[in-house]
Amino acid sequence: YPHQGGEVEHFCEALLELMPEQNFLLVAFQVEDWNRDFSPWEAPAAFGTEAFDGQGARTLKWLLEEGVPYIDRTYHVKEQEHWLAGYSLAGLFALWSAYECDIFSGIACCSGSLWFKNWDIYMREHTLKRKCSVYLSLGGKEEKTKNAVMATVGDRTREQEKLLLEDSFAERVVLEWNPGGHFADSGKRLAKGIKWLMEKRYELKNYEK
């Protein structure tokens, strides 16, 4: 789970409140530059002057070659399912990762930055790399912005859900709408995504039996 600042504690509290009896390992990692390290490719600034440097591939390479193997060795979870969750640009990164590698069987993209330049083209031209459950969420007010770029997030997210529902590797897909704007209850929104993935995991396990 890629995080920013002090949101981990809030996320953990919300997760334990929603799933008090579940057994899971939550690992958070932080990057030096959010716009640089989570953007899948270069793009102009959506607001302000800070552009996106497109170093997401480097972050994913570190995650696959160092981060996940370290977690597997340290906590002996190599045989367990691995999920990736993120909020905002980190949510986009998590979703993009599912199109780029076959490690993650669950993705939670919460208030994802699907307004990112050319993401609409990318998602139409790619399919998931493995069987995967995908949770999407968005705040009801997020698309109601004067920023023309960010105002596309609603339609982009709806189209993303539609494409995933048509993807043969997508086992379960949902788009959940939350009250409020982009910065409302980020920890709780992430926790809801993990809870949904957990519920779908048990549904699939029971179905396979």
Q: What does each model-found stretch correspond to?
A:
Residues 103-115, 132-133:
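A conserved short beta-strand
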Residues 75-87, 107:
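Alpha/beta-hydrolase fold nucleophile elbow
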Residues 91-101:
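Short glycine-enriched nucleophile-adjacent loop
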Residues 30, 85-87, 110-111, 137, ...:
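Alpha/beta-hydrolase-fold catalytic nucleophile elbow
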Residues 59, 87-91:
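Active-site loop->helix "elbow" adjoining a glycine-rich segment at hydrolase catalytic centers
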Residues 1-62, 66-76:
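Serine-hydrolase catalytic machinery in alpha/beta-hydrolase-like enzymes
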Residues 15-16, 97-98, 161:
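A conserved amphipathic alpha-helix that caps or lines the catalytic cleft of carbohydrate-
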